[in-house]
A protein has these predicted regions:
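Cyclophilin-like peptidyl-prolyl cis-trans isomerases
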Residues: 1-298
């Protein structure tokens, strides 16, 4: 169910594909999900592909289809089936769920207290208790588990410690890789772990995933120089494909992951104050969120 919630943005969901028998929503394709609730795929049923080609894709059925163990049922259309019948690829469908998502990440502690109070859920705070602190972790992660247990534990950090990033539009594969690796595809706050950091080097490199980075073609390579605060990813032109990095000073030779420009894909700019990142050590987790603001400094 959380997978479905993650697809809905501002109460709407974008159609990726339409056919006579179903609508497809493919934004989270590639995210592996467990086999859970398997039922007949009757008209109005919502399923998520849990195995094989197209894993992670959401389907809403216009016609009855046979039961498949590769599809997990996550819901059923109650009202508005006529909108599903006429929706076309590229259009948006307004969605209202009987149960709203209890997603607390990237909200302040004060906001979360009110949300959980209204939901009748006990709030357990782990660590920082300031009202203006930003929630970066919640346990359980999923709405259905929070409601079942009647309580949730949250971890917060100071607002200035949250690393916000404005992503570019001309490196779609690389941006998606970063969001997949960090968890930003499904959640408003993600995590990346420091792989390499040496004082005085003015660079921090984060862990990657070679398997997920397979096929990461060159896109949005630097031209004349890399600017401080830019986030870069090593592409498939290098053996270190998938590594993520940031530089704290401009460089005319090497990218944010210490690779040449041909092996570097720039995915965005850090828009928050990032000087403290240079002081962090290997193994430290950095919390990240997407931003629409411009970089705070150049």
């Amino acid at each position: 169910m959380e997978h479905l919630f993650a697809l809905v943005k501002d109460g709407k969901i974008k159609v990726s594909y339409d056919s006579e028998s179903f609508l497809g929503f493919y934004e989270l394709a590639g995210l592996e999900k467990p086999k859970e609730h398997i039922t007949k795929r009757n008209r109005g049923t919502l399923t998520i592909r849990n195995d094989g080609v197209g894993v992670g894709k959401l389907f809403i059925y216009r016609e009855n289809r046979v039961l498949s163990p590769n599809h997990t049922t996550v819901g059923h259309i109650v009202n508005g089936m006529e909108l599903i019948d006429i929706a076309k690829e590229g259009e948006f469908v307004t969605v209202k769920s009987e149960q709203e998502r209890l997603m607390l990440l990237n909200k302040t502690q004060a906001e979360v207290k009110n949300i959980l109070s209204e939901a009748g859920v006990e709030h357990i705070i782990d660590g920082l208790e300031d009202d203006d602190a930003v929630i970066v972790e919640q346990t359980p992660k999923h709405t259905i588990d929070i409601l079942k247990e009647g309580k949730v534990t949250t971890k917060a950090i100071k607002k200035e410690d949250l690393c916000t990033i404005k992503f570019v539009d001309n490196a779609p594969r690389s941006v998606r890789y970063f969001k997949l690796l960090s968890g930003l595809l499904e959640n408003p706050v993600g995590q990346i772990k420091i792989h390499f950091a040496v004082p005085g080097m003015h660079i921090v490199i984060f862990e990657g995933d070679k398997k997920a980075a397979k096929g990461l073609i060159p896109e949005n390579n630097p031209v004349d120089k890399v600017i401080r605060g830019q986030i870069g990813i090593t592409n498939m032109a290098s053996k270190s494909v998938g590594l993520i990095g940031v530089r704290f000073e401009d460089n005319v030779e090497f990218g944010p992951t210490a690779e040449n420009f041909e092996s570097t894909n720039i995915i965005g700019d850090i828009t928050s104050d990032y000087d403290h990142l240079e002081k962090l050590k290997e193994g430290v987790v950095v919390y990240v969120a997407e931003s629409n603001n411009e970089s705070w400094v150049r």
